Amino acid sequence: MEALILEPSLYTVKAILILDNDGDRLFAKYYDDTYPSVKEQKAFEKNIFNKTHRTDSEIALLEGLTVVYKSSIDLYFYVIGSSYENELMLMAVLNCLFDSLSQMLRKNVEKRALLENMEGLFLAVDEIVDGGVILESDPQQVVHRVALRGEDVPLTEQTVSQVLQSAKEQIKWSLLR
């Protein structure tokens, strides 16, 4: 019961994983220290893959965690939450990630296309979940925000690194004139 008190009241995820059809990691983002070392993370990922890759279900309970998953051609997508997390919210995150990638990759959600567009994957995951807290579940909004990152974004919506990069570009162009 104490764990419930310590957890935030917002919907959260513990990890988002994408594995290939051999169970090898293509993308992994852990939001807490349930598995603090890379060795423990990879062992957990192999365990998940071995339990889920032969079944058609969408949810599993493993090591006290709720795992929702989906496969596409040669990829396996996983969203992991605590055992008391709302499974529908975890599935909403999974569907949002998959649908966002499907739109970004023009419905070609497979390993090669994903590896060629990893920056889009990182941006999409950051738009959907921040620090484990679910921010967005609408794939249209995610795709729109990811597309904005490549265009001129208003100064109020930019990160510090984006502002510095923009300032460097402006200074460079003013010196070249």
Curated annotation (Swiss-Prot):
Its main location: cytoplasm. The modification N-acetylmethionine is found at residue 1. Keywords: Acetylation, Cytoplasm, Cytoplasmic vesicle, ER-Golgi transport, Golgi apparatus, Membrane, Protein transport, Transport. Belongs to the adaptor complexes small subunit family. It comes from the Eukaryota. InterPro entries: AP_mu_sigma_su (IPR022775), Clathrin_sm-chain_CS (IPR000804), Coatomer_zeta (IPR039652), Longin-like_dom_sf (IPR011012). SUPFAM superfamilies: SNARE-like. The lineage of its organism: Eukaryota, Metazoa, Chordata, Craniata, Vertebrata. It is a peripheral membrane protein. GO terms for biological process: intra-Golgi vesicle-mediated transport; intracellular protein transport; retrograde vesicle-mediated transport, Golgi to endoplasmic reticulum. It comes from Homo sapiens. One of its GO terms (cellular component) is COPI vesicle coat. This is Coatomer subunit zeta-1. It is found in: Cytoplasm; Golgi apparatus membrane; Cytoplasmic vesicle, COPI-coated vesicle membrane. The coatomer is a cytosolic protein complex that binds to dilysine motifs and reversibly associates with Golgi non-clathrin-coated vesicles, which further mediate biosynthetic protein transport from the ER, via the Golgi up to the trans Golgi network. Coatomer complex is required for budding from Golgi membranes, and is essential for the retrograde Golgi-to-ER transport of dilysine-tagged proteins. The zeta subunit may be involved in regulating the coat assembly and, hence, the rate of biosynthetic protein transport due to its association-dissociation properties with the coatomer complex. The gene is COPZ1. The keyword Cell membrane does not apply. Oligomeric complex that consists of at least the alpha, beta, beta', gamma, delta, epsilon and zeta subunits. Transmembrane segments: none annotated.
